[in-house]
C-alpha cells in the first residue's frame, strides 16, 4: 500500500493540474512534435499517452510533426546528403519524393497508430488532403549578396491554411496528426518547415497555445543558460548578435508570428524530458522558454 506521503504527493499533483484543466477545456493546443521525442521508444510512448490524456480532459490537441533525422537517414540510403540553408532543407525533386514518403507515410502513420493504441482517435493528414495547406515556392534572401534570392527547390512558403477540415475532425473528437507537406496551384508538392506550419496553423485555428518540442531545454543564451522568457524585442537582439541561429531560427520566427497574430502563448520545450508536454500545460512552473509579445 502506498505511504501517506506518496498518496499526498499524487493528490497535490492532481490539485495543481485542476485549474489548468478548467482553463484549457475546449481550447486548441497546437503541438509541433519533433526531435528525440520521435526517436526514443519510451518518449514516443509517453508522448502518445500525454496527447490522449489532454484530449480526455477536454482539450483539443493538434499535432504537426517533423522528421528530419528520418529523412536524412533515408537520403543516405540512396546516396544523397541533406543540405540546409538558413535552417531550411534544400529540396530537389528526388529529395521531395523521399520527404513525402517519410513524412506522409512512415512517420505520420506511426504517430497515428501510437495514439490510437493508447486510446485516442487520431487521423493522419498532409496538407495535400483537401488541399488544406496551400503553398508556393519559397525563395531565401542571400545574406552575402544584397538584393539576391536563393532558390532552394520544392520548399514551400505557406499561402493559406483552410481550417474547415481540422474543425470537422474536432467536432468528431478526432486528433489530427499533420505532416508538413503543402500543395501548389499546379498540384506540385512542397516541403514546408514543420515549425512554420505549426505556427501558421495555430494562428488560423486561434489556438490557446503553440508548443514546439526540441532537443534543447529551450532557447539558450551564449553561455548555455536557459532563457525562460523572451519578448519580441529581446528576440531581435538575440538574432542580431548571433545567439539564435540554425534550426532555432524557424522556431523563433514561428513563435513570434504566432503571438503577434492572436495565439495566447508559445512555448519551446525539451522533448527529451518525459512528459514535458504535461509539465508545460498542467503545472504552475511549466518548462522551457515562453515567447510573448512586447505588450
UniProtKB/Swiss-Prot annotation:
It is an enzyme of class 2 (transferase). One of its GO terms (molecular function) is acetylglutamate kinase activity. Keywords: Amino-acid biosynthesis, Arginine biosynthesis, ATP-binding, Cytoplasm, Kinase, Nucleotide-binding, Transferase. SUPFAM superfamilies: Carbamate kinase-like. Catalyzes the ATP-dependent phosphorylation of N-acetyl-L-glutamate. PANTHER family: N-ACETYLGLUTAMATE SYNTHASE, N-ACETYLGLUTAMATE SYNTHASE, MITOCHONDRIAL. This is Acetylglutamate kinase.
Amino acid at each position: 500500500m502506498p505511504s501517506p506521503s506518496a498518496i499526498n504527493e499524487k493528490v497535490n499533483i492532481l490539485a495543481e493540474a485542476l485549474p489548468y484543466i478548467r482553463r484549457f477545456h475546449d481550447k486548441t493546443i497546437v503541438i509541433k512534435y519533433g526531435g528525440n521525442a520521435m526517436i526514443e521508444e519510451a518518449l514516443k510512448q509517453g508522448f502518445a499517452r500525454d496527447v490522449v490524456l489532454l484530449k480526455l480532459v477536454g482539450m483539443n490537441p493538434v499535432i504537426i510533426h517533423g522528421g528530419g533525422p528520418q529523412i536524412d537517414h533515408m537520403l543516405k540510403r540512396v546516396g544523397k546528403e541533406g543540405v540546409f540553408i538558413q535552417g531550411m532543407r534544400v529540396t530537389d525533386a528526388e529529395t521531395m519524393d523521399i520527404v513525402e514518403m517519410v513524412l506522409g507515410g512512415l512517420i505520420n502513420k506511426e504517430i497515428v497508430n501510437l495514439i490510437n493504441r493508447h486510446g485516442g482517435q487520431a487521423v493522419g493528414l498532409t496538407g495535400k488532403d483537401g488541399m488544406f495547406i496551400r503553398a508556393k515556392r519559397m525563395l531565401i534572401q542571400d545574406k552575402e549578396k544584397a538584393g539576391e534570392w536563393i532558390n532552394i527547390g520544392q520548399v514551400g512558403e505557406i499561402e493559406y491554411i483552410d481550417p474547415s477540415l481540422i474543425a470537422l475532425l474536432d467536432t468528431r473528437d478526432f486528433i489530427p496528426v499533420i505532416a508538413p507537406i503543402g500543395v501548389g496551384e499546379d498540384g506540385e508538392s512542397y516541403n514546408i518547415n514543420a515549425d512554420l506550419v505549426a505556427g501558421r496553423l495555430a494562428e488560423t485555428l486561434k489556438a490557446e497555445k503553440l508548443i514546439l518540442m526540441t532537443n534543447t531545454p529551450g532557447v539558450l543564451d551564449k553561455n548555455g543558460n536557459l532563457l525562460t522568457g523572451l519578448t519580441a524585442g529581446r528576440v531581435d537582439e538575440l538574432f542580431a548578435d548571433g545567439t539564435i541561429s540554425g534550426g532555432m531560427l524557424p522556431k523563433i520566427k514561428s513563435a513570434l508570428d504566432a503571438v503577434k497574430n492572436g495565439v495566447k502563448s508559445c512555448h519551446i520545450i525539451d522533448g527529451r524530458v518525459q512528459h514535458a508536454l504535461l509539465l508545460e500545460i498542467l503545472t504552475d512552473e511549466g518548462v522551457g522558454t515562453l515567447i510573448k509579445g512586447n505588450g
